[in-house]
Amino acid sequence: MNKMSHSEEFAAGEMNAIRASVWQLLSSLYAKELSRERICELAGAELWQAFAAQVELQASASQIQAALAHAAKYDASQGGDDARLELAADFCSAFLQNAEHCAAPYASLYLGDAGKTERNETASYDTESQDKAARSLYGEKHQLMSDYLRSAGLGLDADFREPSDHLAVILGLMAHLCTSATEESQRAFLESAILSWLPEFNARLGKLKLESPLYGALGDFTLAWARLDTELLGG
């Protein structure tokens, strides 16, 4: 293999930093509800327009920007907090309800035994199944991500009280790998830890009846970005 020139190394490093920033942004959007300041910051960001220039991201990026701009403009014009509270309610409905009724953002619920229960197309979801899903949140996938974090010298914020297989944690770890791991390692993690369950998660998210299109579009964007990043890594 030919050694890269300094200019090629710089370009690769710059691209990896950009990729890392996208993954980190997505991680933050799944981690907690948006504050008024964060809504205004993201609504005015030019990055959504930049994303919209990429055909795979165009539709979802435009929807995200429009939803954020609407929320920021509405609250500013009304001098209130109604749009922010609506988005907070959507966040709760999308990610914080019982796993039967939301798109629970935990890898454990889509992979392994719990995932098999979750993928059942029938409407039944008995107490035993719920207990099994609850136990799995701190089971194998949680432990696997905890091990990943430790090996990378990372940890969770004290105020983030979620299992390590939460989507926000996994996306944050992907951001870290963009600038610290080989392309082969990044692609392997992306395929095994993210794309192995993200399509099913996004399908569930898309079926929810939410007030704003923000989180549905966020799910579409996340999946499209994950697939695009796999291509960037030569997958």
UniProtKB/Swiss-Prot annotation:
InterPro entries: Chaperone_TorD, DMSO/NO3_reduct_chaperone, HscB_C_sf, TorD-like_sf, TorD/DmsD_chaperones. Disulfide bonds: none annotated. Gene3D superfamilies: 1.20.120.1820, HscB, C-terminal domain. The keyword 4Fe-4S does not apply. One of its GO terms (cellular component) is cytoplasm. It comes from the Bacteria. One of its GO terms (biological process) is protein folding. Its main location: cytoplasm. Belongs to the TorD/DmsD family. TorD subfamily. Involved in the biogenesis of TorA. Acts on TorA before the insertion of the molybdenum cofactor and, as a result, probably favors a conformation of the apoenzyme that is competent for acquiring the cofactor. NCBIfam families: PRK04976.1. This is Chaperone protein TorD. It comes from Shewanella amazonensis (strain ATCC BAA-1098 / SB2B).
